[in-house]
Amino acid sequence: MKKVILGLVAIAALVSCKKEDNGNDSTIQEGTFPKEVTYKNENGKVASKLVSLIEGGKILSSEMEIYNENGSPIRTQKDIITYEGNLIKKRETTGTGDDPNYNSFTETFSYDGTKLVKSVTDYKKVVKTITTIYSYDGDKLTNMVKTEPIQTTENGQRVEGTKYTETNFTYNGDRITVKEKTYTKKPSGFITDENTSFKIYTVVGGNVVKKEVTYSPSAKETIEYTYDTKNNPMVNNLTKIILPDYFIEKSRGRNNLLTATITQVRNNQTFVSKEYYEYVYNDKDYPTSQKHFIEENAQKKPAGSIEFQY
């Protein structure tokens, strides 16, 4: 899990090389990419910092450092990026700290033109490979299938099976229905641990404005989002290539998130909560800082902040 969190944060910054949608150009325009990103917790203490090296319009490397409550580094992650043309071919990650086994891995990417069709993550210190295959209908992502090894039992013995995560996308105007099915296949081919979930996203103007999740007939959740009209450094042509399902992520909309209203219904009871985001912008309409608040007892309580240096 720690590797996943680190990996998501690093690749989120990695692909935030903003350039206006101009064909399939995925190089970086000077002044629009945050070369240094600092994350602070609700108490204003630095939780992590990410610094990237950029040359020739490309990110060549990045380094993330994670800190404890006392400000001491507890974990680092260093990335070396290689390209094929303007597309990322490989990301080699070396991690140190409390969980180096899952912080050290290599990701390789395969394309059909500029469409990502396969990504493979190989861990360096544990024997584990995760593969994701992507399918499209024209320019629309229709299916993702992720496979990874998992320990299971068969005939009373511990054996290695394969966990599948199949994600299907169905489009109907502004609404996108995402069906996710997970299951484990044992060496004999027997399938177990099946689970299916549905989420509906409403996307308007390049932003997710609503997310609807049904957990059971008596448990549902709806999240409604609002945005500013400024530039979001986390969305660009490279984002759309390297993260094909970017369009269902609230943080990867065309603009920056302002509010999130979460309505949960459980056993005929309704619970509502809100989150807020405040920004300071530079003269190019990119955020230089983001403050995150949660509503508690009708008051806004700090929940963390981010600082961007371009």
Map each language-model feature to its residues:
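Positively charged n-region of N-terminal signal peptides that target proteins for export
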Residues: M1-V4, K18-K19
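Sec-dependent N-terminal signal peptides
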Residues: V4-A12
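Buried hydrophobic residues that stabilize the cores of well-folded domains
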Residues: K19-Y310
